């Protein structure tokens, strides 16, 4: 009979493994971009992350699905997710967009947990979370990372919103938010209103640019 009990040390080791794996994936993406550029180093973005520049540089080359446009119905989805406190993996626990009707939804696609630019982004959303809440909006982060990584990252940064796991990237593809050649999401943000209609789209959201957050907030204020 297998012993199914786990110590806190076991979970800490799993968390360390997840963080190390995410870092290796980001490093691999950076190296791939350098190789494509003839060995030239990838320039850093304002967030200070060379990997973030890799994602930005790849946007033009990524195969583009038809992105949902402002005024169109947002594609529905149902995905497992994690919060800092709990994993939601069973089919009847997963989050669907349809279940969120009646709330404005900020859907933030990002490349990878633990990377520099993505940490800047989610922590900025964390710090403005109460402000968005007053506008009847909830934030959903979404990447291809597993829920186990999501939960460790959410705990580490005390994130107050869910992180969805789109491991096969089918949702990211439906929202033109996936880079096929790197296997990561683009950094994009959608604002979806209470009726499930797209009201704002930014397919080149910048994690460290205050203007992008301000423009999102301005659109959200119109929906009060």
Residue ranges and their predicted role:
Residues 78-105:
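A short beta-strand-turn-helix
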Residues 2-88:
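N-terminal targeting signals for export/organelle localization
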Residues 162-166:
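Short acidic-hydrophobic, aromatic-tinged amphipathic segments that line or gate anion-handling sites
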Residues 159-161, 178-190:
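Structural micro-motif
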Residues 75, 104-106, 186-188:
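Short loop/turn microsegments at loop-to-beta-strand junctions
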Residues 113-159, 169-173:
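Structural microenvironment flanking redox-active thiols in thiol-disulfide oxidoreductases
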Residues 186-224:
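Thiol-/selenol-based redox modules, centered on thioredoxin-like
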Residues 106-107, 139:
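Hydrophobic beta-strand anchors of alpha/beta hydrolase catalytic cores
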């Amino acid at each position: 009979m297998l012993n199914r009990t786990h110590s806190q040390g076991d979970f800490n080791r799993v968390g360390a493994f997840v963080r190390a794996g995410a870092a290796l994936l980001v490093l691999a993406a950076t190296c791939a971009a350098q190789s494509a550029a003839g060995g030239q180093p990838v320039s850093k973005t304002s967030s200070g992350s060379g990997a973030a520049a890799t994602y930005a540089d790849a946007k033009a080359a990524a195969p583009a699905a038809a992105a949902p446009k402002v005024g169109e119905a947002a594609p529905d989805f149902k995905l497992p997710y994690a919060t800092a406190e709990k994993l939601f993996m069973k089919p009847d626990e997963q989050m669907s967009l349809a279940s969120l009707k009646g709330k404005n939804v900020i859907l933030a696609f990002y490349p990878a947990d633990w990377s520099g630019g993505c940490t800047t982004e989610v922590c900025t959303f964390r710090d403005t979370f109460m402000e968005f809440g007053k506008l009847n909006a909830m934030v959903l982060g979404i990447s291809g990372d597993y829920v186990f990584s999501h939960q460790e990252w959410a705990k580490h940064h005390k994130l107050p919103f869910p992180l969805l796991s789109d491991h096969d990237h089918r949702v990211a593809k439906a929202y033109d938010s996936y880079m096929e050649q790197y296997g990561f999401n683009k950094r994009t943000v959608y604002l979806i209103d209470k009726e499930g209609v797209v009201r704002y789209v930014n397919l080149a959201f910048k994690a460290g640019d205050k203007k992008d957050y301000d423009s999102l907030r301005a659109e959200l204020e119109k929906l009060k």
